[in-house]
Amino acid sequence: MPTDSTGEATVPGDRWVEFAQIDNVRDLGGLPVQNGGTTRFGVVYRSSTPQNLTESDMAKLLGPIGLRTLIDLRLPDEVEREGYGLLATADVRRVCLPVRKSPQSSLAARDLVPDSSRVDLVDLYDKLLAGSAESIVAAVRLVIDAGHHSVLFHCAAGKDRTGVLAAVLLDAVGVPPEAIAADYALTGERMHLVRDRLDALPSYAGLPPVSTGILGVEAEVMRRFLAKLSADHGGAAEWLLAGGLTTGELARLRAVLIAPE
């Protein structure tokens, strides 16, 4: 039976990583890949904000998880106000790669979604992709760098900006759209925890109820986003190549993320 980075037995559907004060952490391993195989456990993790982590959470990240690279997709004003908590002094490569709707858009978090109770998530994700090519390609290159694994990437909720990057990574290596959409929808299991935490923080107060507006988590949203990515760009791999990733780097991404059979 495969094991995760903590050495515990895993199955493909058992990808949650539990922490005391980080609510929405999943290993990107165990997902099916077209033409056979699965994604590799213990390499890349997606997460909600880790800023409230405890000493025990830190010990798990630096020990069993083996965290070496933290990719922060939040905007500069979020980083300034919310910070990193204990991770601020950790021996971890920390890289801020803001994901926003356009290179010219405001760097204020509130401008990502002016009305959090009413938002077209497919349109938002398409704009985040278009406005953040440099950050997303840079994030992919950090994932490729096997000398600095494991990698954890996060935003605030671990759903939207994190979901776009996860979708690009997984689609680029051949994970089927249905599996990517199912992974995206898993955040719904933890959204009540995420909402309560974020609503208590200065940058995010006033969030709508769970499953409403920006807090919606439906697999169909990700299916539609991936369909648009395919129709407009030929899929994530072609989008990354158009954004400056080389064919050699794309091959290395696949080698890093796909487990040998």
Summary of predicted features, one role per range:
Residues 1-152, 164-261:
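Cys-dependent protein tyrosine phosphatase-like superfamily
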Residues 157, 161-162:
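Ser/Thr-glycine-rich phosphate-binding loops at phosphate-binding pockets of nucleotides
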